[in-house]
Regions:
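A gly/ser-rich beta-alpha-beta helix-loop segment of oxidoreductase catalytic cores
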Residues: 1-16, 87
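Phosphate/pyrophosphate- and phosphate-bearing ligand-binding catalytic cores of soluble enzymes
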Residues: 20-140, 147-148, 152, 156-166
Length: 166
């Protein structure tokens, strides 16, 4: 995955990744240029890989400036994201020309829920677990949100979270 937020992406700091290839049970090291990074994707999603280690290339900087940037980003994250409930993070990718959370909110789904699986009332781009939501309930909610948004706006919401099936 090529996670990113606030103008940065993992592709900018990953030097290499050690993976286990489940097709042949070999451990491989992949350099940044071999990872084929794109928006929220890398070769990891297309192959049968499990990430074992990541080597990052970080830059030295002024401690106080780094701390100030960290505090600013932490405050922005805390003010916008539903951190008081369990979630897998941002549920949907940003569709071209739109914001997933705005489409979901405009579709009237903010706060919609199936038992304990909820579209967050704080940020509608997140599906949260307000108790004991099951995998089935979360998947039903994701699929319902996708269906309603498509019916209202003809925009297909693609999941940002990686869904593993049996």
């Amino acid at each position: 995955m090529n996670a990113g937020a606030y103008g940065g992406e993992m592709k900018d700091i990953v030097e290499s990744v050690e993976v286990l290839d489940f097709d042949n049970y070999e451990v491989k090291e992949l350099k940044n240029e071999e990872l084929d990074f794109s928006y929220r994707k890398s070769i990891i999603q297309r192959k049968n890989y499990i990430v074992l280690t990541i080597k990052l290339k970080l830059k030295k900087g002024n401690k106080e400036e780094i701390k100030a940037v960290y505090e600013d980003l932490r405050e922005r994250r805390n003010s916008k994201q539903p951190l008081n409930f369990g979630s897998a993070g941002s549920t949907f990718k940003r569709p071209e020309g739109h914001f997933a959370s705005k489409l979901i909110e405009d579709a009237g789904l903010k706060g919609y829920h199936i038992n304990d699986a909820w579209v967050s009332e704080k940020h509608s781009g997140f599906i949260v677990n307000k108790g004991n939501a099951s995998y089935k309930e979360v998947m039903e909610l994701i699929e319902y949100v996708q269906k309603v948004v498509f019916e209202k706006f003809e925009v297909k919401l693609e999941t940002e979270v990686r869904i593993l099936k049996d």
